[in-house]
């Protein structure tokens, strides 16, 4: 891909994020899971089923973000500002509030749904949740830096979604702010500067993709590419939620 000037690259990234936001609206916000959850009609046991799988997912996806530091190190060595910001973001995931990091926050929210560490760490994920994770894993090791950081556009939408979930859980499902801390923390970490100056993850992802475009290093593979990877990762989040409902019906947590 040819190098873009700063204004063109910024506009390209903004247009991509607008497409991702629209797809999230269609596949996640307007999906059955979120419609029922937002209305307070989703049984607590069904959300617990989702969170058992999602908790396991978060542990593994954070390790992939750490691996991206090594995988794309030649690029980051050219851009010490981004290298420092990514190092900060990775450290944030693993040392706050204390090692092993955000996993402790996730387990606090899991406990509010009666889930144990063993439930999260020792039970297999739903196939669709595993599929989302393994799409990211394959893209990290087989894809380009631009494809990876386009996939990471989902982090901005997840941050917004986490804020919505926090509001729903604390107003309609009786969770305390401390019990719902996984969602408030991720809303903050993804969208805001936090923990003594750590850049919001979404801002870092935008800046990295923009720099790849500006330097002519935003390479894409046939049948993959920047837009496909961004939108597919969003589609897979919707699929995870829908598959939770299907599993809940199989387990008779919901009426068929």
Q: Where are the regions that the model predicts?
A:
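Non-heme di-metal
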Residues: 2-256
